[in-house]
């Protein structure tokens, strides 16, 4: 019988340069918490004619499952990853970000008396203004990223993620967290072991997309 991993890490990829995806993948494979699997969901990328991503996944097939489908956006891609993962806990990583080596073990230690956590990040920006994003409830107001619930910092039990779906709306991460609060025990924690590259050249945000809000009709 196949071993059930403790943690499933879900990563949706759409036209992210391979060197950035590789950095993200390697940050998962180099965790000090080894009992994990990585589910790569290729959201119909068109920039990988040489199949670098698939080939790299095959090199680490004991840890990585590769799924490809037609482009439908981050939320639906992560939802599909949830359906195809096996872990008792589920984590998310954006394809242009990375974990510090202790990130997942940090998250596991925070799960006492919680079913779902959202953590702060170490945020890397080009400009000071990039630390601020439009408020979900009032787009004329800006809030610091430390005060946001970021899609990729969510970490929780399998039950939370299989009970709820990410919606194709702006601030899908905050909406998910709010819906989870109605049924589960939640915590916002200060870890700083998730490296969040915001509006850096080559990142999702730099490619005219707002992280966590890709729409799919």
Show where each model-derived region lies.
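Short, acidic, metal-binding catalytic loop of nucleotide-sugar glycosyltransferases
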Residues: 25-35
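A conserved acidic beta->alpha catalytic loop
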Residues: 42-51, 94
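Acidic donor-binding/catalytic loop of UDP-sugar-dependent glycosyltransferases
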Residues: 48, 97-110
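Glycine-rich, basic loop-to-helix element that forms the pyrophosphate-binding segment
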Residues: 69-85
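Short aromatic/hydrophobic "clamp" motif used to bind/position activated sugar donors
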Residues: 90
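Conserved donor NDP-sugar-binding/catalytic core segment of glycosyltransferases
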Residues: 104-131
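Conserved nucleotide-sugar donor-binding catalytic segment
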Residues: 137-216
């Amino acid at each position: 019988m196949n071993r059930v991993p403790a943690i499933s890490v879900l990563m949706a990829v759409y036209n992210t340069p391979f060197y950035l995806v590789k950095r993200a993948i390697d940050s998962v494979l180099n965790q000090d918490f080894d009992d994990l699997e990585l589910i790569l969901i290729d959201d119909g990328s068109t920039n990988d004619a040489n199949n670098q991503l698939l080939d790299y996944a095959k090199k680490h097939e004991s840890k990585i499952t590769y799924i490809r489908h037609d482009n439908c956006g981050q939320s639906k891609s992560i939802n599909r990853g949830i359906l195809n993962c096996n872990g008792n806990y589920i984590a998310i990583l954006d394809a242009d970000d990375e974990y510090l080596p202790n990130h997942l073990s940090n998250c596991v230690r925070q799960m006492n008396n919680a079913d779902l956590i959202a953590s702060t990040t170490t945020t890397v920006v080009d400009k000071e203004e990039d630390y601020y994003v439009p408020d979900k409830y009032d787009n004329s107001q800006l809030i610091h990223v430390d005060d946001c619930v970021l899609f990729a910092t969510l970490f929780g039990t399998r039950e939370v993620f299989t009970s709820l779906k990410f919606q194709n709306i702006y601030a899908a991460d905050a909406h998910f967290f709010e819906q989870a609060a109605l049924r589960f025990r939640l915590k916002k924690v200060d870890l700083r072991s998730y490296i969040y590259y915001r509006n850096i050249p080559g990142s999702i945000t730099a490619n005219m997309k707002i992280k966590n809000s890709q729409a799919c009709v």
